[in-house]
């Protein structure tokens, strides 16, 4: 039986699969990113797309629609100035300018409920266009 986590702010449910895919990304490193969407009819947060281990940041950006909101988590691997391999998990709240106002409000009010379920996120980025979440922005936040 599928378990769901209740979001207090909007009466939104976070499906158990959302946390499961996140934990697989975090601990097993079998995914590079997970994109989440809200299904307005069922009032639930669902997994929209999962990026395989060979996919990178460009594929994540390409998976985000230009006219609808999404949440995403990305496992960013990088090398520090001390030549140490590190990994940081980013939560991205994607709310493009072309998306519906209702969707923007729904995603904004439901964000914290999903964040509580995704334990282990290091940084959060809110973006309305691709320049606000460019690779250099992500790399700069991680270091």
UniProtKB/Swiss-Prot annotation:
The record's similarity note reads: Belongs to the actin-binding proteins ADF family.
InterPro entries tied to this protein: ADF-H, ADF-H/Gelsolin-like_dom_sf, ADF/Cofilin
What biological function has been recorded for the protein in this entry?
Actin-depolymerizing protein. Severs actin filaments (F-actin) and binds to actin monomers.
Keyword check for Transcription regulation, yes or no.
no
Boundaries of each ADF-H domain copy? 11-143
**Which Gene Ontology MF annotations are present?**
actin filament binding
Q: Give any single GO term for biological process.
A: actin filament bundle assembly
Q: This chain belongs to which protein, by name?
A: Actin-depolymerizing factor 5
Q: Give the UniProt entry's GO cellular component terms.
A: actin cytoskeleton; cytoplasm
